[in-house]
C-alpha cells in the first residue's frame, strides 16, 4: 500500500509541474497578438512655413477587423489638415496609411493618437471588435524649426 501512495504522490507532483509549465507558457507575452502596430514617419526638422507630411502606418495582428480613429493633438494651436480626424476599418493583412500635411511655423510637439472605437457603417457588415485591455494608443513626436 505504501508503494501505491508513493506512485500517487509522484503522479500528482508530475501533474502539478505540467500544469504550472502550461500556465507559464500561456502567459508568455510573445505569443499574444497585438491589437495595433504603429509606425510613424515624420521629419525631425523643418524650415519656417515649410509643409511637412506626417505619415502613420497602422496594422493589426488580430484576425478580426476593428474601427480606428486617427488624429493629431498638439501643445500649440495648429490649423488645416492637422485637425482632421480620420476613421477607417483596419483588418489583418491590410495595413492602413494615414497622411496629414501640416505647415510648421514654430517648433511643435504633437501626439499621434489612434483610438479603437465602436462605430457603425465603417467595417463590412458592422463586424468589428474592440479589445478589453486598451483602446487608445499614442506616441509623441517633435518637429524642430530650423
UniProtKB/Swiss-Prot annotation:
Gene Ontology CC terms, in alphabetical order: apical plasma membrane; extracellular region
Keywords assigned: Disulfide bond, Pyrrolidone carboxylic acid, Secreted, Signal
Main location: secreted
Location in or out of the cell: Secreted
Signal peptide from the UniProt entry: 1-26
Sites bearing Pyrrolidone carboxylic acid, chain numbering: 27
GO biological process: regulation of immune system process
Disulfide bonding pattern of the chain: 65-91, 89-123
SUPFAM superfamilies, per the entry: E set domains
InterPro entries reported in the protein's UniProt record: Ig-like_fold, Ig_E-set, PIP
Summary of the tissues where the protein is detected: Lacrimal and submaxillary glands.
Any Pfam family matching the protein: SVA
Domain of life: Eukaryota
PANTHER family recorded: PROLACTIN-INDUCIBLE PROTEIN, PROLACTIN-INDUCIBLE PROTEIN/SEMINAL VESICLE ANTIGEN
Stated family: Belongs to the PIP family.
Self-association state and partner proteins as the record states: Monomer. Interacts with AZGP1.
Protein name (Swiss-Prot/TrEMBL): Prolactin-inducible protein homolog
Organism: Mus musculus
Lineage of the organism: Eukaryota, Metazoa, Chordata, Craniata, Vertebrata
Amino acid at each position: 500500500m505504501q508503494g501505491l501512495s508513493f506512485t500517487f504522490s509522484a503522479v500528482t507532483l508530475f501533474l502539478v509541474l505540467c500544469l504550472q509549465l502550461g500556465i507559464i507558457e500561456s502567459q508568455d507575452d510573445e505569443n499574444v497578438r497585438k491589437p495595433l502596430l504603429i509606425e510613424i514617419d515624420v521629419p525631425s526638422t523643418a524650415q519656417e512655413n515649410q509643409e511637412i507630411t506626417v505619415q502613420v502606418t497602422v496594422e493589426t495582428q488580430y484576425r478580426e477587423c476593428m474601427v480606428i480613429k486617427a488624429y493629431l493633438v498638439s501643445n500649440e494651436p495648429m490649423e488645416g489638415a492637422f485637425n482632421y480626424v480620420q476613421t477607417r476599418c483596419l483588418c489583418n493583412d491590410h495595413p492602413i496609411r494615414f497622411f496629414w500635411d501640416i505647415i510648421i511655423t514654430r517648433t511643435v510637439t504633437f501626439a499621434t493618437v489612434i483610438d479603437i472605437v465602436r462605430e457603425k457603417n465603417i467595417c463590412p457588415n458592422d463586424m468589428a471588435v474592440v479589445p478589453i485591455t486598451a483602446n487608445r494608443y499614442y506616441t509623441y513626436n517633435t518637429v524642430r524649426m530650423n
